[in-house]
Amino acid sequence: MEENINALDEINKGACMGMDAIKFIEEKVTGDEFKKSLEVQYNKYSDISNRINELYSKYDKEGTPHETNKMTKVMAMYGIEMRTTVDHSDSKIAELLLKGTNMGIIEGRKILNHKKVDKEVEKIMEEFISMQEDSVENLKKYL
């Protein structure tokens, strides 16, 4: 049961970080197609997070899924701000999002490879990883 909770927490943190990053950089994006693409990605992260919230109560009756802690969030946003001060092109933004998305894929794969989780938790994790892999392919267009 604990491994299911931990897996759901980690995936939810990744989804929340993805949503936070998109919200943070969306005003810097200049291309309309890229903006639409990020909106679609944001909605996918939101959907996964909502589904995790629904599933979470099955494993923890009193808790809610963990989100990214404030310090991690602030450091990530500060890093984005610093890296886009000189080069705030859509290409640079896509590069930063790609790096973050790859971190999410790696974390998700590690969890799947090393933890024993229930089938429904495994399914949502697979969907999250697949969604991020699709996002990587999409972001490559904007490099």
Model feature map: region roles:
Residues I11, G18, I25, I48, ...:
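Amphipathic alpha-helices that form helix-helix packing interfaces
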Residues E26, Y56-Y59, G63, L112, ...:
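Leucine-rich amphipathic alpha-helices with coiled-coil/heptad-repeat character
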Residues E3-I11, D32-N50, D90-L96, E120-M131:
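Alpha-helical scaffold segments that form or flank carboxylate-/histidine-based iron centers
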Residues E26, N43-S46, N69-V74:
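Short N-terminal helix-initiation segments at or just after the protein's N-terminus
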Residues N50, E54-E95, K99-M103:
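Carboxylate-rich helix-loop segments that flank metal/cofactor sites and access channels
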Residues I93, G100-L143:
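Preference for long, well-ordered alpha-helical segments
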Residues M1-T30, K92-K116:
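Alpha-helical bundle segments that constitute or directly flank the non-heme di-iron/ferroxidase center
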Residues V29-D32, I52-L55, Y59, K115, ...:
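Hydrophobic stripe of amphipathic alpha-helices that form coiled-coil interfaces
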